């Protein structure tokens, strides 16, 4: 009976321990107040918005990192940090994690994405087999034999010295010969024992290598994919395509997952900045003597792309932790004399990546194992089996579609559940020639509009009833629209396409015109009295547009005739 109680108690402890690994991302986290979102509300007195491009560029061996200036009123209000990464063909964005959650949109290209989640198992295995290097085995064998021989010679010299001190030369000679024969047998026995042990060690290492490499999930990414990441989760990206891989990433510095301050910090596990430490130290001293704004901007750059966290550990500690590696490997772990930056040119990197249909098949099998309900059991299935990407560039999956005006694709926690853990979402909008979106506002989120194609005109109106932005936008620009600000966009002659990244997992927009608009939900009499118009005009105002959010441009009869010819 006591044995059963002990086993039951041990099982409970194991379950609690496993749950603790994944607790920061459990759904219950939503009940926690968004401390950071409330902390910076006093900074949201926005009088003027600007459509901006990256203000700083950081070059690496195989790519470029471009950073927006987040020390503007709208960026401070939203708590956003925006970064664009360009990875050249064959380039590898080194593994890193952040103190804040973020969401990435792949603008162009294709590649491979890796995700490492604490507490999740290594469920992927490469097909290629590794051969333990023969030269390394020989080197270890020669080194061990040399050490063994040295110890044997030292024992021989010590014994001979003791024998000579006894006085009788014949006895010494006889005993020395006897000792020599015994010591020879001892050395031979020790050598054979060492050889067998070394052989077993090499055999064990060889068997370990022959089983192949095991790792956590990797998946293929392409243009239109949205990739989220919680704080502290390691991700890396490899461009195995023929063109540049371009992505835009939005960090939520005000998230409750950020326990530090209002700044975003990236922690790299490899690599090093192209600048030397002395250069960075010199620049830091120069900034301290300069303006506060310049100092803040440069500090933000360094926090995002400064150093490898292993650089700060001493060699002795790393050698104790990572056994069976030489000093050269330890030096490379720390990034000593590595000036390639954080996007490096990969060599002989061949990954077995499951295709999308294989991922779906594996996910369906997991659902069937859970009884087909799709619900998690509260342990690793709560997080480890979640999707880490969703494509928003598929017309067949559009949430709003107007064949003559455009479409809207939304990714939120309903179709990508991991977004519920990080409180972020995205929306991809395509407007055809001269089409219009809005006016509308975000009920519960700030949004960052990043233009991916074309150009158009945008108007934004703030809480004081006056325009805070009225200008054209073009590809590569970001416009931050605070919560509640009404925005309308009209595409140019080449159309307009953009992605909106928002800091709520289920961001809701409220249109002012159209079939699902707020005006459509208000009685005609209320509209008539509100605007001091007749009920007939109020009815026209309410029902003038039958489309949903995406509108055809108004055209006069003459304009229609000109288009026909």
Curated annotation (Swiss-Prot):
- SUPFAM superfamilies referenced in this protein's UniProt entry, alphabetically: RmlC-like cupins
Which Pfam families does this UniProt record tie to the protein? Cupin_1 (PF00190)
Q: Which part of the chain is the Cupin type-1 domain?
A: 49-331, 390-539
Q: Which Gene3D superfamilies match?
A: Jelly Rolls
Keywords assigned: Disulfide bond, Seed storage protein, Signal, Storage protein
Keyword 4Fe-4S listed? The answer is no
Quick one: signal sequence residues?
A: 1-20
Q: Which molecular function terms from Gene Ontology are attached?
A: nutrient reservoir activity
Judging by the UniProt lineage, the source's domain of life is Eukaryota
What is the role of the protein in this entry? Seed storage protein.
- PANTHER family from the UniProt entry: 11S GLOBULIN SUBUNIT BETA-LIKE, OS03G0336100 PROTEIN-RELATED
Q: What is this protein called?
A: 13S globulin seed storage protein 1
Q: Which organism is it from?
A: Fagopyrum esculentum (Common buckwheat)
């Amino acid at each position: 009976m006591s044995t059963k109680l002990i086993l039951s108690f041990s099982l409970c402890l194991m379950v609690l321990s496993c749950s603790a690994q994944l607790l920061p991302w459990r759904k219950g986290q939503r009940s926690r107040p968004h401390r950071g979102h409330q902390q910076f509300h006093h900074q949201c007195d926005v009088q003027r918005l600007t459509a901006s491009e990256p203000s700083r560029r950081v070059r690496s061996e195989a790519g470029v990192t471009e950073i927006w200036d987040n020390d503007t009123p709208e960026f401070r209000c939203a708590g956003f940090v925006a970064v664009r990464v360009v990875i050249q063909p064959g380039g590898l964005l080194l593994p890193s994690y952040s103190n804040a959650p973020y969401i990435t949109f792949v603008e162009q290209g294709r590649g491979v994405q890796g995700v490492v989640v604490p507490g999740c198992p290594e469920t992927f295995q490469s097909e290629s087999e590794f051969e333990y290097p023969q030269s390394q085995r020989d080197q270890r064998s020669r080194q061990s034999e040399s050490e063994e021989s040295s110890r044997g010679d030292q024992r021989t010299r010590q014994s001979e010295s003791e024998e000579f001190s006894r006085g009788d030369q014949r006895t010494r000679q006889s005993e020395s010969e006897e000792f020599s024969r015994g010591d020879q047998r001892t050395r031979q026995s020790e050598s054979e024992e060492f050889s067998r042990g070394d052989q077993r060690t090499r055999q064990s290492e060889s068997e370990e290598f022959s089983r192949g490499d095991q790792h956590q999930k990797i998946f293929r990414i392409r243009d239109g994919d949205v990739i989220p990441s919680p704080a502290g989760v390691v991700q890396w990206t490899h461009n195995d395509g023929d063109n540049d891989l371009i992505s835009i990433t939005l960090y939520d510095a005000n998230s409750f997952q950020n326990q530090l301050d209002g700044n975003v910090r990236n922690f790299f596990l490899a690599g090093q900045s192209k600048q030397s430490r002395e250069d960075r130290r010199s620049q830091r001293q120069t900034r301290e003597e300069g303006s506060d704004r310049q100092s803040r901007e440069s500090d933000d750059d360094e926090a995002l792309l400064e150093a490898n966290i292993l650089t700060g550990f001493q060699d002795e500690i790393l050698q104790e932790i990572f056994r069976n590696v030489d000093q050269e490997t330890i030096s490379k772990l720390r990034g000593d004399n590595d000036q390639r930056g954080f996007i490096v040119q990969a060599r002989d990197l061949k990954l077995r990546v499951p295709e999308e249909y294989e991922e779906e098949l594996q996910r369906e099998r997991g659902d069937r194992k859970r009884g087909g309900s799709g619900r998690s059991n509260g342990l690793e299935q709560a997080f480890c089996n979640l999707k880490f990407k969703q494509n928003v560039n598929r017309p067949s999956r559009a949430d709003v579609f107007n064949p003559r005006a455009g479409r809207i694709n939304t990714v939120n926690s309903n179709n990508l559940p991991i977004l519920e853990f990080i409180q972020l979402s995205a929306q991809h909008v395509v407007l055809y020639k001269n089409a219009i979106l809005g006016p509308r506002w975000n009920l519960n989120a700030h949004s960052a509009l990043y233009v991916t194609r074309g150009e158009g005109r945008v108007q934004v109106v703030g809480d004081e009833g006056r325009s805070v932005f009225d200008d054209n936008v073009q590809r590569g620009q970001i416009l931050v629209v605070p919560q509640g600000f009404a925005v309308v966009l009209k595409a140019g002659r080449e159309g307009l396409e953009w992605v909106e990244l928002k800091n709520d997992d289920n961001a809701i927009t409220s249109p002012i015109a159209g079939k699902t608009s707020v005006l459509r939900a208000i009685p005609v009499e209320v509209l008539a009295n509100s605007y001091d118009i007749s009920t007939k005009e109020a009815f026209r105002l309410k029902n003038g547009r039958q489309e949903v959010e995406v509108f055809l441009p108004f055209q006069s009869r003459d304009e229609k005739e000109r288009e026909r010819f």
